[in-house]
Each structure stands twice: as structure tokens, then as C-alpha cells.
Amino acid sequence: MRFAACFFALCFAGSAAAWQVPEVEAATLPQEARETLALLRSGGPFPYHQDGTVFGNREALLPRRERGYYREYTVRTPGVRDRGARRIVVGRGGEYYYTDDHYRTFRRIRQ
């Protein structure tokens, strides 16, 4: 019985740790990310037609939620002709995440 309790505790502790996303203050983000946050607060309009599309969280770096919970928005990158690698991902619960390396890492935005 003790083994089973320890096993389940380790399993749940590991899954919770996987969702420990570092935080970043909104004021320390690049200017373009702060502009995207302002657009999100005002409801747009957004410059890219892909903005607002479902982010699938296939990388499983954010807390697991049902499909459609997360939406992604482009953060302009000066000097880049395409959308670049920077995004803000927004959860339906009001949480915001920033990635500057095309979903390899995330930081939760504190506003």
C-alpha cells in the first residue's frame, strides 16, 4: 500500500512540475510584445490573419486543457519578412504566455 501511495505521489508531482512555467513581467517584454498585449486588451484589430487561431499545445509545455482553450497571436519582429518566432498565447482563463523561440519555451506574463 505504501508503495502505491508513493508511486502516485511521484506521478502527480512530476506532471505538476512539467507545467511550472517561468514568469516574466509585462513591462520587461520587448516593445512589440507590449504592443500585442495592448491589442489583446482592446480586442484588436490584429495585423496577421493567423492571429486568434487555436494553439494546440502539442509541445505540452503549457497546462493541458481541451482543444480550443489556447489562442495564439503574433508578436512583430523587426527586420523579419514573415511572422517570425515570437508569439503570445492566451488561455481562455485569462492567462498570457510569451515565446520568443517559436514554442520551444514559454514564460507566463505577469501584468
Regions found by a protein language model. Name each.
Residues 18-63:
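N-terminal secretory signal peptides
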Residues 13-15:
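N-terminal signal peptide c-region/cleavage motif recognized by signal peptidases
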Residues 44-111:
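Functional cores of ribonucleases/endoribonucleases
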Residues 1-7:
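Bacterial N-terminal signal peptides that target proteins for export
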